[in-house]
Amino acid sequence: VKIAVIEYRSTPPKSALELIEAIERRNHTPVYLKAHILDAVITGGDISIYHGREEVNIDGAILRNIGFFLSLEVFMKRLGVLEALAQKTPVVNNPLASFTARDKWRCLLRLSTHGIPVPETLITENPFSAMRFVTSRKKAVLKPIMGSLGLGSTLISDPDTAFTISRSLKNIGIPSYYQIYLEKPGYDYRVFVVGDQVIGAMKRVSSYWKTNIAQGAQGIAVKAEEEPEVYELALKATRILGLEYAGVDIAYDTSTQKYFVLEVNAFPHWEGLRRATGVNPPDFIVEYVVNKAKR
């Protein structure tokens, strides 16, 4: 079975290398495809995909990343080519589902519409709306609409600060995305889903308000019997978004005594989860894609 790993970097990053190694361990053939040199051609009723000059002939693909800070035209081109590829062969995750999840607002909108509890969230281009949101909620987290690892997230309690930042963002054409600050008990959860099962979950413990592993949090394994509601929420959120593997971030709010889905990552990192649980996600992802390719 020939399985592709799709990235945008010229040299495979660590996560892509680990997927390639997992493919090789199963005696299958890995192919590394760079998103920026993938092309699609429609001829009559047929679709052909090219990687440079070479036609792509694979049995399945694992989508990891198509790049950051893209123009709208480049983003639409890459998404369109991946959609074309997905018509010919299984692509995991599905391109459209992946980019619904990558857009934090559309992700939460979809989840909320289907009854999944999410934090109160504002998206706006109006600095006055941002100021009013922080004034009435006391504390809010300003996040990049597309981002990961906790980078760029800022805790704001001063309405004037919210106004100033949102006005600056507006001036460079970027909307503001604010989420009410949840009073967490010093940790939140990362749950890793592949197919219809949770392969591993951890508490991310930190004395800092950010609980990302990349921001210094410590991962502690959590079993299903310890947190059944967390496991169930993660599975439901993944299913609603149409994802086949995902890292789901869930927090418990001590003020409301409820669980909330913060975001769902369609291109999740797994190093911290592997250290905490001993589970190696690339093995599960590759096994899932190979089985799907054989159907």
List where the protein language model places each region:
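Active-site nucleotide/adenylate-binding loops and adjacent lid/helix of ATP-dependent enzymes
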Residues: 1-6, 55, 82-88, 95-183, ...
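Protein kinase-like catalytic core scaffold
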Residues: 140, 199-200, 246, 258-262
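Glycine-rich phosphate/pyrophosphate-binding beta-alpha loops
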Residues: 265-278
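Conserved N-proximal alpha/beta basic substrate-recognition cap immediately N-terminal to
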Residues: 9-118
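Short hydrophobic segments within beta-strands
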Residues: 6-8, 194
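Generic beta-strand structural signal
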Residues: 123, 193-194, 252
